[in-house]
Amino acid sequence: MKISANSIRTGNILVYNNDLWVVSKTPEHTQPGKGGAYVQVEMKNLKTGTKRNDRFSSSDYLEKAELEQKDCQFLYFEGNNLVLMDTKHFDQINVPKEILEAKLPFLTENMIVKVEFYNDKPLTIVLPPTVILAISETDPVIKGATVTSSYKPAILENGIKVKVPQYLAIGEKIVVKTDDMTYVERAK
């Protein structure tokens, strides 16, 4: 599917120079005083991991990869692979761990994730926007600390470090964003 260079967004997967590239930063739209408007795009090759910056005229059209998305349930780790089960057809799928990269610690047993396929090959895994995790290490609660803008460091049950409000203690469950690993709220 062709899309305008102005329509490119972070996370889009493009077919460019016969390779698949993911847009890794928000594209910069520029209108210089002289010449035509252009879009500066930072992309990462999904096969090799190399990054590149390209400039496209705002009138250019690029090929956006048509991805098939399936809901899958995470079952277990097997070597360097994740074993997932298609929730519709109950087929088991092996996906390399590298696909998740830094988001791997958020993956919990039986979690439902979205797997995006290109030509029947798994490309990306989309985690839920938030997860509930328990605090395993943090400084003690300060008596009288209310909801303020001051935060303290905490380590969660999956090993991720986040900043949490002063009033939270070890063992409490919190909601964390999976995209930027930040605290949202105390779990209800």
Swiss-Prot record:
Domain of life: Bacteria
Metabolic or biological pathway, per its Swiss-Prot or TrEMBL entry: Protein biosynthesis; polypeptide chain elongation
GO MF assignments: translation elongation factor activity
InterPro entries: Elong-fact-P_C (IPR015365), NA-bd_OB-fold (IPR012340), Rib_uL2_dom2 (IPR014722), Transl_elong_fac_P/YeiP (IPR020599), Transl_elong_KOW-like (IPR013185), Transl_elong_P/YeiP_cen (IPR001059), Transl_elong_P/YeiP_CS (IPR013852), Transl_elongation_fac_P (IPR011768)
Compartments where located: Cytoplasm
Pfam families per the UniProt record, alphabetical: EFP, EFP_N, Elong-fact-P_C
GO terms under cellular component: cytoplasm
Entries under SMART domains matching the protein: EFP, Elong-fact-P_C
First-listed, main subcellular location of the protein, grouped into a coarse class: cytoplasm
UniProt entry tagged with the keyword Protein biosynthesis: yes
Keywords: Cytoplasm, Elongation factor, Protein biosynthesis
Keyword Nucleus belongs to the record: no
Biological process per Gene Ontology, one example term: peptide biosynthetic process
PANTHER family per UniProt: ELONGATION FACTOR P, TRANSLATION ELONGATION FACTOR KOW-LIKE DOMAIN-CONTAINING PROTEIN
Function, as annotated: Involved in peptide bond synthesis. Stimulates efficient translation and peptide-bond synthesis on native or reconstituted 70S ribosomes in vitro. Probably functions indirectly by altering the affinity of the ribosome for aminoacyl-tRNA, thus increasing their reactivity as acceptors for peptidyl transferase.
Family: Belongs to the elongation factor P family.
HAMAP family reported in the protein's UniProt record: EF_P
This protein's name: Elongation factor P
Annotated source species: Rickettsia prowazekii (strain Madrid E)
Gene coding for it: efp
